[in-house]
């Protein structure tokens, strides 16, 4: 998650090799990283920015605590997978957004990506294909599962399965799902207001829904009605080609 990461853009000599840059960054690490270097996982990349001094370049430094990376790698190992790359969430969103950008209506410049995960909801605002704002809230699909669990006397696992299979009593839509959807709208509206109050923007052009809870029935429609912006569910397969063998 972006909140667990430190990013810093620093100037360095253009003629340095990557090995030399790494040595220099590690020597100067205390300036940029507020925890011991042996507890850090860090990486860097030379940015394509053109500086006034052609002998200097901007270098993006990214660091997080090593335990943050190891915890996620261990989860993958339990699933029989091996992690090859650890990326920052906001950078991943920028890369993924390139897939959707061409599918949006003409004139759409400022897009809010509302990612509703299991425990966290993140609003990332895109402007010219770059993330210009991110806000995370501790709220997600887990709350809906817990409401199902409490309402119908199920275990958490049973509630999760019932939510996915939509095998719930007739009063579910009114008594449980409806209030949850309203809570999602409130969270989204609050995040947007924080964005507007901290920037020169007072509106966005479009909202893309993403995450494991993006396809909850009625969510996109309710967000569009309440917030006043067009809302669509992000579909990464919309422009993807398939092999004739599939």
What role is predicted for each listed range?
Residues 90, 151, 158-206, 213:
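Adenine-nucleotide phosphate-binding core of ATP-dependent small-molecule kinases
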Residues 177-180, 202-232, 236-238:
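Glycine-rich phosphate-binding loops at beta-strand->alpha-helix junctions
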